[in-house]
Each structure stands twice: as structure tokens, then as C-alpha cells.
């Protein structure tokens, strides 16, 4: 089993690949809505870059990105697909992440997130609460303002991947997809252009999957058991 993460532009990487290099790609591209400090429920913490530095969400990817993703992948899941309908074919297999866990919600946050797919299955709903600071995954290490929980990717892999599949995430961000793939035994390739998120996601992966803890003096301590 391999798990590779590259600090590179995903479009350049995909252009270097032959057709259908991956069995399943799961992408979480920028929605083009930006994230302003104090308006997204994510305060500032030592584990994340300041939101003042967030520029990656100012615009959505070009059509070329989606064309390349579909070329190098057999099956594709794209979070925020409702923002890209003018760039993607019509889909009958949407995935819904119910972030309220089926309960009534009056917050400023969206009740759900939608994922477009190129598959022919029926619409499915995944329920896991994550509304700002109210979250069923509050103990998970947070390093990214739009971080999706590892449990979500575990569910996606259980339902849309099969044994032996090769998984790709073109914009790995927090690394949740990589962690889920590793723990479930899938070969994984990811790209992350931002150097800070790239390094933080490696640190998170090493902690959650390899039991490594980076000490203040820069040394690495390895846990004998994981939690």
C-alpha cells in the first residue's frame, strides 16, 4: 500500500498522467466564496494559518481542471458541485452531507454540502453534525478552515470504492482523505499546492496514522500505541 502527497499544482500533475490513472478521485475545490475572519465559525488557532492569509478560495477552478480530473479518473466525487454545474455534465448521483444530523437548525451555516459525481447510482445522504464550533468531530486535529472530517471520507470509500482501488485527491488540504485511505488500506495520491497546509497535513498524517508526535525541540517521538 502506498500513500503519497506532493507539494505541487494538481493541474500540472494531472496533465502528466495517462487516462484513467485512478479508480476514484475525491475533490474539494475552492467554492469561490472566500472566508472572512469571524464569519465562518473557525477562529484562529496555532494549528492553522491565519485566515487573513486565505486567498485560495477567491475563485473556482477553470473548466480545464474538471476536464483533467474526469480524464484521469474512472469515478469522480466533487464537493461543492452545486457551484460548478456550468462546468460539469448533468449528474443523477449526488451525495448530500447533512451537517445538522437531521435536526432543525437556525444558524448562518449551510445545513448541508452537496457533492457532484459522474456515477449512475442513486442520491445518498451522509449525516454527521458539523456546524461551526458545534461538531461531532471536535476532537479531530483542525488545520484548515474548510476541513472535512475523516469520518466523511471513510463513508465515501466504504460506499464508492472497492478493494484494490487507487484513490486521488487533487487538493488534499487538511489531509482527511489521505488518513481515511491509509486506515482503510487504499493506495492514495494527493496534491497540495500550499506549502503550509502541505506540511501541516503531513504532520497530522504522521500523528494519526504513524503515531509520530513532533516535540518543541524539533525531535520526533513515536507512540507505542495509537490512542
Placement of each model-derived feature along the sequence:
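Class I S-adenosyl-L-methionine
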Residues: 17-27, 31, 35-50, 70-227
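A short glycine-rich, Lys/Arg-flanked "PGG" loop and its adjoining helix->strand segment in the class I
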Residues: 59-75
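A conditional alpha-helix N-cap/helix-loop micro-motif detector
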Residues: 7, 58-62, 146
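Conserved SAM/SAH-binding loop
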Residues: 8-12, 219-220
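Extreme N-terminal starter segment of soluble prokaryotic enzymes
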Residues: 1-5
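A short acidic, glycine-rich active-site loop
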Residues: 49-63
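Short, well-ordered alpha-helical scaffold segments within catalytic/effector domains
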Residues: 11, 62-66, 150-154
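SAM-dependent methyltransferase catalytic region
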Residues: 6, 10, 225-227
Amino acid at each position: 500500500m502506498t500513500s503519497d502527497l506532493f507539494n505541487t499544482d494538481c493541474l500540472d500533475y494531472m496533465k502528466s498522467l495517462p487516462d484513467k490513472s485512478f479508480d476514484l478521485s475525491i475533490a474539494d475545490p475552492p467554492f469561490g466564496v472566500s472566508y472572512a475572519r469571524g464569519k465562518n465559525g473557525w477562529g484562529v488557532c496555532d494549528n492553522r494559518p491565519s485566515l487573513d492569509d486565505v486567498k485560495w478560495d477567491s475563485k473556482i477552478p477553470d473548466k480545464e481542471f474538471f476536464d483533467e480530473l474526469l480524464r484521469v479518473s474512472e469515478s469522480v466525487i466533487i464537493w461543492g458541485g452545486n457551484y460548478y454545474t456550468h462546468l460539469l455534465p448533468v449528474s443523477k448521483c449526488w451525495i448530500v452531507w447533512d451537517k445538522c444530523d437531521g435536526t432543525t437548525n437556525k444558524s448562518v451555516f449551510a445545513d448541508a454540502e452537496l457533492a457532484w459525481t459522474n456515477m449512475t447510482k442513486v442520491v445518498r445522504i451522509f449525516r454527521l453534525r458539523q456546524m461551526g464550533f458545534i461538531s461531532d468531530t471536535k476532537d479531530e486535529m483542525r488545520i484548515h478552515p474548510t476541513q472535512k472530517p475523516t469520518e466523511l471520507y471513510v463513508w465515501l470509500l466504504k460506499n464508492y470504492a472497492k478493494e484494490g482501488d487507487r484513490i486521488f485527491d487533487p487538493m488534499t488540504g487538511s489531509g482527511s482523505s489521505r488518513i481515511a485511505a491509509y486506515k482503510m488500506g487504499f493506495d492514495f495520491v494527493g496534491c497540495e499546492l500550499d506549502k503550509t497546509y502541505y506540511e501541516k497535513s503531513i504532520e497530522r498524517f504522521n500523528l494519526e496514522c504513524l503515531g509520530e508526535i513532533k516535540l518543541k525541540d524539533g525531535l520526533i517521538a513515536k507512540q507505542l500505541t495509537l490512542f
